[in-house]
């Protein structure tokens, strides 16, 4: 896949970063007066180009035989290592060791954290990326930063080639003991600001069996400030978690603090899919499509243009009205706080 020209991305980042950034304490949510429709007013990148998530459908897919299986290094973490699990008011986030790395990318990327996006108990459509319009129950993001060029996540988050995220789609199925190593601690992080210690485990077990079967494209953070600095690798086959595990995800957590007189459930914390003009998605597979992907056949790619029309929110898509979290945090707290 042709990489996003570094000079172009650097120019885009420079133009926006010359504008005053929102101060700490700016609010954002998924609906309501601070919802995603008004994100661009406070966070200009959210109304810009190369935005994520997107829908994967055949007319934007291009088979790339040069794509190699994702290789993991250091993902089997000793139980003596402790991960910090945090409710940051937008999601539940677990810090990871920088000794965890991914290979077969243009740069070396080291792990920083993972977090989840999900729906609600009445409508389990919580993934951010979709396949031919199909949502999955939830989505796990494992966030890595370019450790060849930057010292940490904070310094890489707004830079060209700064981040690489592995996205794992999740669907209802069998009980998943690996995800339970995280989910079993939810009672200790029910409210915003609460933390828990999770013993190390084999994080590889959170990923699908095949690491050579994925979509790849240049995109952005899916939360404010939406920097277009992410190389996305979205695995095609979802992993299974049980009904009970999904319910724990959808019913246990709050986006408010424990003493808030009006507690708000943390549900529907996913961004709607964005327009995908003048870009291509490279795929590592040519076999029959996964369920919901459409008919098999040759993938067609759009030419990568040099002009980028203003992005539009996809029509016909709605965000559930049950989520109304308004949080006063750092502008990119889902990644760094």
Range-by-range predicted roles:
Residues 1-337:
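Alpha-carbonic anhydrase
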């Amino acid at each position: 896949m042709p990489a996003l020209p570094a000079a172009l991305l650097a120019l885009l980042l420079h133009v926006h970063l010359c504008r005053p950034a929102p101060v700490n304490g700016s609010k954002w949510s998924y609906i309501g007066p601070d919802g995603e429709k008004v994100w661009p007013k406070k966070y200009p990148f959210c109304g810009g180009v190369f935005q994520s998530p997107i829908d994967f459908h055949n007319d934007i897919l291009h088979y790339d035989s040069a794509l190699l299986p994702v290789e993991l290094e250091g993902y089997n973490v000793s139980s003596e290592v402790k991960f910090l699990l945090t409710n940051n008011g937008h999601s539940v986030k677990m810090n990871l060791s920088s000794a965890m790395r991914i290979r077969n990318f243009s740069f070396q990327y080291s792990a920083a954290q993972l977090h989840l996006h999900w729906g609600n108990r009445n409508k389990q459509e919580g993934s951010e990326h979709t396949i031919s319009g199909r949502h999955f129950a939830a989505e796990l993001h494992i966030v890595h930063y370019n450790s060849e060029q930057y010292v940490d996540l904070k310094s890489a988050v707004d830079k060209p080639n700064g981040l690489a995220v592995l996205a794992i789609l999740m669907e209802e199925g069998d009980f998943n003991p690996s995800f339970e190593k995280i989910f079993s601690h939810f009672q200790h992080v029910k409210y915003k600001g609460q933390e828990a210690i999770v013993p190390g485990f084999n994080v590889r077990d959170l990923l699908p069996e095949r690491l050579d079967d994925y979509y790849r494209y240049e995109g952005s953070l899916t939360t404010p400030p939406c920097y277009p600095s992410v190389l996305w690798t979205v695995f095609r086959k979802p992993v299974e978690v049980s009904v009970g595990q999904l319910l724990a995800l959808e019913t246990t957590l709050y986006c408010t603090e424990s003493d808030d007189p009006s507690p708000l459930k943390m549900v529907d914390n996913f961004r709607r899919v964005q327009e995908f003009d003048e870009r291509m998605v490279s795929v590592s597979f040519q076999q029959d499509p996964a369920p919901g992907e459409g008919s098999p056949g040759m993938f067609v790619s759009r030419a990568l243009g040099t002009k980028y029309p203003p992005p539009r929110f996809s029509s016909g898509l709605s965000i559930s009205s049950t989520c109304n979290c308004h949080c006063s945090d750092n502008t990119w707290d889902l990644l760094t706080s």
